[in-house]
Design a protein with these regions (language model features):
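Glycine-rich phosphate/ribose-binding loops and adjacent secondary-structure elements
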Residues: 189-322
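Short, well-ordered alpha-helical segments in soluble proteins
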Residues: 180, 184-187, 217
Length: 322
């Protein structure tokens, strides 16, 4: 077994999170539940002594490759808590002493209109009430860190507006604030640590969003119900200047760790190119030295699963002199 996550906590590097494919999770979970006949023993190649059990990256005993951290979206999960133990068993039944799961809230599925919801009755519609409740409870039950239920800033753009009816960035922010208030008022403190999702396509929209939601992380306002970390979305992932300016504002506002808060997780969504991995590591080290020693930065990508779905594989580079 190769342990690729053994130094995640102590190395000082920003932590890479594989965004785990729902299709992959479902097939491994069906194997555990005995609900599929897609993988008879004769289909398992020689050398795979643990069969499909070995394909579970969270299984430290049987996994051919073990990795301690991952990201999985509520937008792909079975939100029925008991049903999820079967359909998403690979991730939700993991050994939580040795693994960390960051949960995405499903904002992409909502903002893109993939989930059919009644946008004309956003606050009081039965479908919206159920979605908010089910996502909150799933994240609390199965994730160590969880993103808040945002309505992404891009959801008002023309290609999505016909499905969502959103008029402008302010409309996205207003609805996000409503969802945040629901999470604050209905969460069970201690079950998961929530990451306040920060959007922005430029400094102007980033500031608008930040000013609208920053108080949700303020313990002097919400006590132990306050959100504990941040998810950097929109152009914060990809625009280094925008990200750094946002972190400086968070520092100056005293929101990178308050009072007894000994764990501040900052996730940068959907970026994993090597230069950004190096940059985020440098940023984490500086924040730990000068602001709060308990800050952790992570970043994610679905590349391992997308690559495999296209019949491709990673290999080590040839570094000889020729």
């Amino acid at each position: 077994m190769k342990d690729f996550g053994k130094n995640n906590k102590d190395s000082g590097y920003a932590i890479f999170l594989p965004a785990i494919s729902n299709f992959y999770v479902r097939k491994i979970s069906q194997h555990y539940a005995g609900t599929t006949d897609m993988f008879p023993p004769e289909r398992i190649p020689q050398g795979f002594e643990h069969g499909l059990d070995g394909l579970n990256i969270f299984d430290k005993e049987k996994g051919y490759v073990y990795y301690s951290h991952g990201l999985y979206s509520a937008g792909h999960a079975n939100l029925d808590l008991e049903g999820s133990k079967i359909d998403d068993g690979m991730v939700v039944n993991r050994n939580r002493e040795h693994t960390i799961l960051v949960g995405d809230s499903g904002g992409y599925q909502i903002g893109s209109g993939a989930w059919k919801l009644d946008w004309t009755n956003f606050e009081d519609g039965a479908d919206w009430k159920k979605v908010r409740h089910d996502i909150l409870k799933w994240l609390e039950e199965y994730c160590d860190y969880s993103m808040t239920l945002d309505i992404p800033l891009w959801a008002w753009l023309p290609q999505y507006r016909g499905r969502t009816g959103l008029k402008d960035p302010e409309d996205c922010l207003k609805k996000t604030i409503f969802n945040h208030e629901y999470f604050i008022n209905n969460r069970t403190p201690g079950k998961t640590k929530f990451l306040n999702t920060l959007h922005g396509s430029n400094w102007q929209t980033s500031e608008m969003w930040y000013e609208g939601v920053k108080h949700f992380n303020d313990k002097s306002v919400y006590g132990d119900r306050a959100f504990e970390g941040y998810a950097m979305a929109g152009d914060h992932a990809g625009d280094a200047e925008l990200l750094l300016r946002r972190l400086i504002r968070l520092r100056d506002d005293g929101l990178l760790g308050q009072a007894d808060q000994d764990d501040v997780w900052i996730h940068t969504l959907g970026i994993s190119v090597l230069p950004w991995g190096a940059m985020l590591t440098a940023v984490q080290r500086q924040l730990r030295e000068h602001v709060n020693p308990n800050i952790t930065i992570s970043f994610d990508a679905a590349s391992p699963y997308i690559t495999a779905s296209k019949g491709l594989a990673y290999d080590y580079p040839d570094l000889n002199g020729n």
